[in-house]
Amino acid sequence: MNTVSVVQFLAVGCAVFVLYGRGVFAAEGVKKAGQHKDAELCLGSDGLGHRLDEFWYNDDMCQRFLCFKDDEGIMYEQIANCPIAIAEGDCTLKPGTKGHYPDCSPRRRIAPLRTKKKGKFKRNAFYLPY
């Protein structure tokens, strides 16, 4: 199977659409962080104070958070989360592993290709993140 055939197969035989959770083409969002009683901490969306430039996670929602200051000293909270993936045709989704973002995000499983090797057909499949 040549490269053109593989591309045609993937384009026609297996359509995988990815819709992102926080915006159309972005899996990250930024919002102004709340002010914590300790000026060196930012108030995260979880209601707790967090140090600047350190990550914290919500493993139940598969999200990663980060507080940072801009050049004007305003604190922001960056939220990264998994896209919502929809598999169609022969494609499937493999659930993410337990743990922190991005490992907890689902992965697309592209449908197996049948390749002939020494007179036998062998099925190959591969995974893509998101």
From Swiss-Prot:
Keyword NAD appears in the UniProt entry: no
Subcellular location: Secreted
Known tissue expression: Expressed by the venom gland.
PTM: Contains 3 disulfide bonds.
A GO term from the CC aspect: extracellular region
Keywords linked to the UniProt accession: Disulfide bond, Secreted, Signal, Toxin
Superkingdom of this protein's organism: Eukaryota
Signal peptide limits: 1-26
Homology family: Belongs to the scoloptoxin-16 family.
Protein name: U-scoloptoxin(16)-Er4a
Species this protein is from: Ethmostigmus rubripes
